[in-house]
């Protein structure tokens, strides 16, 4: 028990040290004090846009510094309680302290990852699209496995999800789906998942039990809020309505409530059929279009930088980012960071935090 407690304490202390540097606690505290003075001045609201910007910055700094101080305080309290429990040989209390420190180390690791979020839209909700690759039923099944993996990942992080659009495969799985992920920093957690995913396994659809390779792609883009301006002109849009697809039965939708919107200049398409109301589906499809166009613009900027660094293909939407091998051995490997694990079951059940953390760490300077 003593060894486990020491290990958890070491992990938390390492996280606190990294967070101290990442947050630049002293400078952030000084900036927060300055912002408190600025936002207390009534004349600030003469420029509402600037006032809102400063209030967002203040709120963000307060949240991060409060979380850091709470983490530090909780560790201090646990260590003091442990010292008393050790002196009294109180095994029950020591066992509870071990569990508390384990939970605290998980919180610290998550906070450490979130401090790597630096993008304008990292705090927003997001959309996740999954599309099966060539290969029919095999790829359709792989796409459905990926959908479950990401739904479980969102659940692990405490996010809510909505399936906005889904097209089933003929025999099994799905051809495509769009999921809305709702929660603070959802885009920050999911944004590195854009790319092509490769699965190697013994096919459940092949009578000869052959080993098969399947591909599916994912694309993540942030939901746009009022703080990010995206201009879309009506003349650039083509809006089509159609009957929502489904398995039939008494609840089958017999009206043209599904909506597809095409942005003609870019060829970008979004569609929604999750609601029986055409009006609501149109509003959701429009929100998705804004998000896609924002992500395309961000990708253009990224590509421009990558061209200068000769690494453009590493960030291309079509680039293979991860392989999942279930036969002849078990291994999931991220091809960008080289991070890998043999816990394929855990990964497919949504355990993706380490993959995300490794990617974010690499993006701010070196592989983790």
UniProtKB/Swiss-Prot annotation:
Residues carrying N5-methylglutamine: 250
PTM comment: Methylated by PrmC. Methylation increases the termination efficiency of RF2.
Localisation per UniProt entry: Cytoplasm
Keywords: Cytoplasm, Methylation, Protein biosynthesis
Gene Ontology CC annotation, any one: cytoplasm
InterPro entries linked: PCRF, Pep_chain_release_fac_I, Pep_chain_release_fac_I_sf, PrfB
GO molecular function: translation release factor activity, codon specific
SMART domains: PCRF
Primary localisation category: cytoplasm
Region forming the signal peptide: none
Highest taxon in the source lineage: Bacteria
HAMAP family reported in the protein's UniProt record: Rel_fac_2
Record family assignment: Belongs to the prokaryotic/mitochondrial release factor family.
Stated role: Peptide chain release factor 2 directs the termination of translation in response to the peptide chain termination codons UGA and UAA.
Protein name: Peptide chain release factor 2
